[in-house]
Amino acid sequence: YTIKRQGDSYNDTDIRSEYASATALRGNLKADNISKYIPVKAGLILSSNTNYIYPDDITEALFTRLLGILFASSYDKNVFIENVMRYPDVNKEIAGRLYKSAMDMITRTVPQGAESKDNGAFSFGSLCEHIKTKEVPLSRIKRALVRITLGLDKKHMEKYANEPYIRVLGFDKKGQEYLSYIRKTVEVPLITKIADYKEMLLDDIHAANIYNMIVAGKYGVKEFGDFVRGPVRV
């Protein structure tokens, strides 16, 4: 049986009770107003890392990607639609709206409904709102745009379904002993050294590089790439 949700509703954007929605927590993160609604340890982790990025921070990466697809499509609407429909969650209607938005971006024309609240320009969030319809929920639009930004089309998704792997992010002394044991029995690659599995992890590395570039541009902080960052030992 299902457990009845307590506190705020799933999509609530405001915090009204001691059990806030994830949507509200993310929305209030900027204002540093969530410490009393999350576990103490989680609060300590958040307070020790202030290099946050938000959906609108990937706007430039998204539109650079869309511009690349336009170029590859010779700016032809039908070819563009065919190309972006290769990505999961993108149907013909979404693809058509994306084409118009991408062309408007080139001519610096912001379609009604896609203005940013900050400066009237395009943003990831405002574009999602512009593209969504009654039949296509906002969550689907966001997934589609992130996949386009990362270049993860349907072929990539099929590859991950058929080629699973385990990437170890961290372990303690006991975990190290366990890893030594399961390495002999596990049927999929158990990855602790990224350089040994470069081809398999290219998409992970690409996504991490986009993140690192955004952080560097926003905060002037250079993040270490996945090739030089090993599992965390605790």
Predicted regions and their residues:
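Active-site cores that bind ATP or allylic diphosphates and position pyrophosphate for catalysis
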Residues: 1-234
